[in-house]
């Protein structure tokens, strides 16, 4: 029998979202099946009308497949537990989740403050969509005088911590106090922590977005996002926007995410352990100027990481004193690191960050140095280190 009264998240992740027992047979599958359905039928009009009332009030209710079935409801429960929230709304990707936040909480003529370390496509969301709708955005760096940037029309602060490319730690409790002082909503992109090692809602944020594509899924085979809140009024706005704009997730992707969270505790621990071993190696290489990884003791954000996080993951960035061509040679010489933009799966990945991407980040002080972002996967760290060594030797 499943007991979800246990407090430790590792235990909860093994039991939340389990299939209920069949009342006739007393049996249940270990894994909740993927419920693929476009149409929902009801026993009576009264049952249908009750579901419609609950949905209109912002509660979880299925009246049509687009709103999600049992598989989706189970995953929403898992995300809410991960983040310490009360309501969860699914979207087809992490960026779709971010767009749900902006479109739910902002109207024409209103203004948002967005941390410059946020996920790069947020700039495209602003330029292609938000600006066209009359929503203004100001990007700020962590050292900025935020009070000077607040306008009478400012409604939202959106931050990603640690940051997307350089893993800059932000003081989330301080941002939360500032937001409360100015009557602003604080929303975060928490894909790095995914609720397992970092929980912005417990630090004062009101909304947290996770790209379940990454560490929640863990196998590089699904796409989905989740928006979690612990604020009833915000939940109603998210609920209405999710419905009105047709945000939807396939049942199979939701099922894959439920599968992924079962192994999240062991995967996250191994990613984090391997990343620190790689940092130990890289710090002694002459080509390496600086490491960006908040769990690394020399990282400027290490104290904030110790205070606010319960663990780490496989993400790090490496500043290299190499020419542009040598940096390209290094990336191309790697054999165990796939060249790609994503992360959070079982595999190791490398991304050569462009100067244009770095120019948006005030945290970057590396000038013309090269920057590579590494995702350290579940492979043997000795093999990964050997691969990095031979690639650096070839690029030198």
Swiss-Prot record:
It is found in: Cytoplasm. GO terms for cellular component: cytoplasm. Its main location: cytoplasm. It is an enzyme of class 4 (lyase). Its cofactor is pyridoxal 5'-phosphate. Pathway: Amino-acid biosynthesis; L-methionine biosynthesis via de novo pathway; L-homocysteine from L-cystathionine: step 1/1. One of its GO terms (molecular function) is pyridoxal phosphate binding. One of its GO terms (biological process) is methionine biosynthetic process. It comes from the Bacteria. Its EC number is 4.4.1.13. Pfam families: Cys_Met_Meta_PP. Keywords: Amino-acid biosynthesis, Cytoplasm, Lyase, Methionine biosynthesis, Pyridoxal phosphate. It catalyses: L,L-cystathionine + H2O = L-homocysteine + pyruvate + NH4(+); an S-substituted L-cysteine + H2O = a thiol + pyruvate + NH4(+). Catalyzes the cleavage of cystathionine to homocysteine, pyruvate and ammonia during methionine biosynthesis. Also has cytotoxic activity toward osteogenic, osteosarcoma and tracheal cells, in vitro. The chemical basis for cell toxicity might be the formation and subsequent transfer of sulfane-sulfur to proteins, derived via beta-cystathionase cleavage of L-cystine. NCBIfam families: cysta_beta_ly_B. Belongs to the trans-sulfuration enzymes family. This is Cystathionine beta-lyase. It comes from Bordetella avium.
């Amino acid at each position: 029998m499943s007991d979800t009264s246990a407090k430790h998240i590792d235990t909860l992740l093994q039991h939340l979202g389990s299939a209920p027992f069949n009342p006739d047979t007393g049996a249940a599958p270990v894994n909740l099946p993927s419920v693929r359905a476009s149409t929902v039928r009801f026993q009576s009009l009264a049952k249908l009308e009750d579901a419609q009332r609950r949905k209109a009030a912002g509660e979880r209710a299925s009246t049509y497949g687009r709103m999600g079935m049992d598989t989706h409801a189970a995953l929403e429960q898992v995300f809410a537990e991960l983040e310490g929230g009360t309501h969860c709304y699914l979207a087809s990707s992490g960026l779709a989740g971010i767009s749900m936040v902006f479109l739910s909480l902002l109207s024409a003529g209103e203004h948002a403050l967005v941390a410059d370390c946020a996920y790069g496509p947020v700039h495209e969301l602003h330029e292609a969509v938000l600006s066209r709708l009359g929503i203004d955005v100001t990007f700020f760096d962590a050292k900025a005088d935020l009070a000077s940037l607040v306008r009478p029309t400012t409604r939202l602060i959106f931050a990603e911590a640690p940051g997307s490319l350089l893993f800059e730690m932000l003081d989330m409790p301080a941002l939360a106090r500032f937001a409360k002082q100015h009557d602003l909503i604080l929303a975060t992109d928490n894909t790095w922590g995914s609720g397992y090692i970092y929980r912005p809602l417990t630090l004062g944020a009101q909304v947290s977005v996770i790209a379940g594509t990454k560490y929640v899924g863990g196998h590089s085979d699904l796409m989905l996002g989740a928006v979690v809140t612990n604020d009833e009024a915000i939940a109603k706005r998210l609920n209405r926007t999710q419905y009105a704009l047709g945000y939807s997730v396939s049942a199979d992707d939701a099922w894959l995410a439920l599968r992924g969270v079962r192994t999240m505790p062991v995967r996250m621990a191994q990613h984090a352990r391997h990343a620190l071993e790689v940092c130990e190696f890289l710090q002694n290489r002459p080509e390496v100027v600086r490491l960006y990884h908040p769990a690394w003791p020399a990282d400027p954000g290490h104290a904030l990481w110790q205070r606010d996080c319960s663990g780490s993951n496989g993400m790090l960035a490496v500043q290299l004193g190499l020419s542009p061509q040598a940096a390209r040679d290094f990336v191309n010489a790697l054999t165990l690191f796939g060249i790609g933009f994503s992360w959070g799966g079982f595999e190791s990945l490398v991304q050569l960050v462009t100067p244009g991407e770095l120019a948006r980040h005030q945290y970057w002080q590396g000038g013309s140095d090269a920057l590579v972002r590494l995702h350290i996967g579940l492979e043997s760290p000795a093999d990964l280190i050997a691969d990095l060594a031979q690639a650096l030797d070839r690029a030198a």
